[in-house]
Every structure is written in C-alpha cells, then in structure tokens.
Amino acid sequence: MTNPKVFINPKSGSIRLTGTVDIVDSEGNVIETIENPKFCGCGYSNDKPWCDGSHKKITKPALTLENARLAKTAIEPFAPERAVAIQIREKLVSARTEMNESIVGLKIGGALESKENQTGAMIYGYLTDAMDVSQGLVAADYIYPRAEAEVVFKISKEISAPITIDQVLEHVDQVSVGMEIFDYRYGQAQIFSNDAIADNAGAATFAYGEWINASMNVFDNLQTSLLSNSDVIETAPLSAIRGNPWEAIVQLSNLASRQGLTLKKDWIIFSGSATKGVPMTSGSTYAVDTPGLGVVTVQAQ
C-alpha cells in the first residue's frame, strides 16, 4: 500500500492528503474511507474534521449572516442557489437553537425571484422565543428595522401535508393582530428570493396582541393601520394578505410540505404584511391597530 502524500498550506494551515485514507474512531474502527481528504480545521464543515465542501457554500455564509446580525453591520448579498439558500437558513437557525433559543413558529414573506424574473415567491423564516419584543426593543440592535402589520395564527393541530381553505379551522383555533419587525442583514441592498431565504426571510423580532377565537369570516371587511407615535403611516385591508389571510396558511402548508417541514402544534404563524414596511427609529412608539382583531404596540428605545 502506498503511503498518502501530505501537502501543508503554509498560509491557511490546511492539510491535504493524496490517496485513500481510512478515518477511524478512538478504538481503531473505520468510520469512513475517503479519497484525497483535506483537513482544514476551519470548523465550518458539517460535523466532520475534514472538509466536505459545506464550509464554503453553507456554514461560512451562515456564520457571516449571524455575525452581521450580532455586529449590526450590513453585508453584500451573495446569491446562493435555491437548495444552498435553504441549507444556509437551516444552519443559521440551528446556531440560534444551539444557544438555547426555541423555535416558536414561522413568518411568511415574499421576494422577487430575480432581476430577470419578477415573479413573486413565497418564502418563510423561523421565529424563536428570543425574537419576542412585546416589552419593547432597542432600534440600535438592528441594521435597518421595519415594522409591518400582520395577522398571527396559532396552530392547534399540526400540519404535515397540504391543506385546503376548508380545512384551516381544523388546524388553527386562534388568531391575533401582529407586528413583525424584519431586518435583512443586507441593509437596504436590493435582494431576491435566494438571498432572502438564506437570511431566514429577514426574521428579526415580533409582537402580537390578545388571542381571539378563529372563524372563517373573522377577517372579513377588516382594515389595519400601522401607526408611529399615534400618526397613521400605512392603512390597508386585510384582504391585501393574499386576497384572504387564510390563504397564507393554505399556501404555507404547500410550501412547508415540499420542504419536509411540519407546522407544529402551538406554533405561531405570521401571515405576511398587509402594509408596506415602516422604518423604525429610537424614541418612537409603533402600533398595529386592526379593529375587530386587536391592537399591538411596541416601544423603540
């Protein structure tokens, strides 16, 4: 058997072996046999000490996005492919759950597919318990925060397959008024669907009001307003949400099913916005007022 050759990159410190290499455990049992492995020590690969290609495509972009969030500094979009964008999102969210945050639901969003393809795409991002800002927020903790007026659904029975609008009340028993604060880590740069997906659909923080019982006509003829310091900035009918807010759940069930995601019991789902996003600044109070559904207020420090 020919011994593998070793190349050490003096700049990066990575080690590349040429030939067939057995990876063994502490007892000498072969775990995996690989050809020409590279051991970079970067910590970016998917739970392996050698590079599997994921560090450049998936984990490093996720780390870049997370660092941008923590540093409140915008980064440039990097236009990943769709499948890679989804994996970046999952890696980004797993970093938060590893810090003991719990997933409590999803936010629905939308983005154009590309500069050439102006078709709108439904996307979603995960919400965690640490994103709840019902007690107020600090505007300086964001890059370019914007508030949106939304509807919030509470899942009463898990959704693991596509459902129809006639089935929504079997899975949602309560609804509320919601304010989503979104904050893409790309700042004010124009982005398209894949960058949006990678950045967890811009999910930043949220707040919602008191729950009320759901019914098929609960949203009929309702108007919502987004206010800043008691001044109405945006107004829209709830029908601006996909023609009927219930359609948000129907369409999400299809998208989640295609991606192998189950909407879990007790999750909250933010519908996507009825209004344009309103930039948030320190010292202002923001409210979403939807008569017939409720009011939610967030103070920005």
What are the roles of these predicted feature ranges?
Residues N46, A274-V278, G292-V295:
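Short, charged beta-turn/beta-strand-edge "cap" motif at the junction between a beta-strand
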Residues D25-S26, S228-N229, T290:
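Structural motif
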Residues M1-Y44, K48:
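N-terminal pre-ligand scaffold of iron-sulfur
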Residues T64-G243, T285, L293-Q301:
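Catalytic-core "active-site belt" of small-molecule-metabolizing enzymes
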Residues P49-P61:
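Iron-sulfur (Fe-S) cluster-binding segments and ferredoxin-like electron-carrier domains
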